[in-house]
A protein has these predicted regions:
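N-terminal cap/lid segment of alpha/beta-hydrolase-fold proteins
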Residues: 30-57
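Conserved HGGG/HGGXW glycine-rich cap/lid loop of the alpha/beta-hydrolase fold
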Residues: 52-135
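Conserved acidic catalytic loop of the alpha/beta-hydrolase fold
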Residues: 134-135, 139-142, 146-164
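Conserved hydrolase catalytic core segment
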Residues: 162-201
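Alpha/beta-hydrolase
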Residues: 205-279, 286, 306
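Short beta-strand/loop motif that positions the catalytic acidic residue
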Residues: 284, 290-292
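Acidic catalytic loop of the alpha/beta-hydrolase fold
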Residues: 295-299
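Catalytic active-site module of serine/aspartate enzymes centered on a nucleophile-bearing elbow/loop
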Residues: 314-345
């Protein structure tokens, strides 16, 4: 009689589960059972899809020494995680951070939110209501910033990070403030970049930069999307420091990776419907620094000063000449500020 090679259903399930788990190094096991693979975007990072519950999966990339302090990076409106410049990531890793970045819901390779029957709403009217102190509460939106903050908190838990540092940019800075306020045990220290409390009567964007929020590309073709992206970055980016070749490359990558314009619309709706987050900013206990460019016309630097005044004991750093981006020229200084703040002994 020959020995049977058959295995039962339980053994098969266990075998498949083992095969689906991959760690770049043994130390990564502490982040949970996830299928990590080489990133398609950066030679410094690994990528995995992380299930955070409620039918939401987030596309996550991480890299650096897993024994170093984790730094979770939260990006802004309509921005896939590729908006974090690769050199910026490398500098943070070299400074001693274990870097984690991800696509927010509704963008990139993360789960998309589609709710049937939502009526069309005027974002311009919502902007005006927000600016003049009128509430957009109850507006028919798919989700709000609190929901996106919940995604971030669930990601921290899904990766078994315990407590982590947060770095939030623009809308991501608003999300980070809410996470730090609602989940103080999850956030050790925080750095915010060109962000806001989203409250009424703040200095508004300059007209040219405001137009970038409501202007749409001529079509959904790759050519028009790339052209629109170049115009956008030339409008909101740092004068004299916008690398057009790099902007084109990233725009093509974003388009080919996942083009989902509804996600940007719904994320902007989330910002407008959420209104002021000052009530959260006031509750932040994590030591915080706020970085803001003096040339930012999209979120004027006075809004960053308000963030720093609203968060208890926060420190404000004005970066002369920088706008609403992370130019190569300013990265060494920015990373020095961030790492000095986060990695205190």
């Amino acid at each position: 009689m020959t020995k049977s090679n058959d295995i039962n259903d339980t053994q098969l399930s266990e075998t498949l589960a083992e095969d689906s788990i991959n760690y770049p190094a043994p130390e990564w096991q502490k982040f949970g059972e996830h299928q990590w693979r080489d990133s398609d975007l950066s030679e410094h990072l690994y990528q995995a899809m992380i299930d955070i519950g409620d039918n939401i999966e987030l596309c996550v990339e991480a890299g650096g020494n897993p024994n170093n302090p984790p730094l979770l990076m939260v990006m802004g409106l309509g921005s896939q995680m590729v908006f974090w410049p690769d050199n910026f990531i490398k500098r943070l890793i070299d400074a001693g951070c274990f870097v984690i970045r991800f696509d927010n819901r509704d963008i990139g390779l993360s789960s998309k939110v589609q709710i049937e029957g939502l009526p069309r709403i005027s974002q311009f009217k919502m902007m005006m209501r927000l600016q003049t102190g009128l509430s957009n509460k109850g507006a028919p939106v798919a989700y709000n910033l609190t929901d996106m903050a919940e995604d971030t908190a669930r990601l921290i838990k899904a990766l078994n990070l315990g407590t982590t540092h947060l770095l939030g940019a623009s809308m991501g800075g608003m999300i980070a403030q809410i996470v730090a306020a609602r989940y103080p045990s999850l956030v050790q220290r925080m750095a915010l970049m060109f962000t806001s409390t989203n409250r009424a009567f703040l200095r508004p964007p300059k007209p040219k930069q405001l137009y970038t929020l409501i202007n749409r590309p001529e079509s959904h073709s790759e050519r028009d999307i790339v052209r629109h992206s170049v115009w956008f970055m030339k409008t909101v980016g740092t004068p004299g420091h916008v690398n057009v070749r790099m902007v084109r490359e990233i725009a093509k990558l974003r388009y080919q990776r996942n083009f989902h314009p509804l996600g940007t619309v719904q994320q902007l709706n989330a910002i407008l419907a959420s209104g002021s987050i000052s009530r959260f900013s006031k509750q932040v206990k994590a030591p915080t620094i706020v970085l803001h460019g003096s040339a930012d016309g999209l979120i004027p630097p006075s809004q960053g000063r308000v963030v720093a005044k609203t968060i208890p004991n926060a420190k404000f750093h004005l970066i002369e000449g920088m706008a609403h981006d992370i130019p190569e020229y300013y990265q060494p200084y920015m990373v020095a500020l961030i790492s000095t703040h986060l990695l205190v002994s």
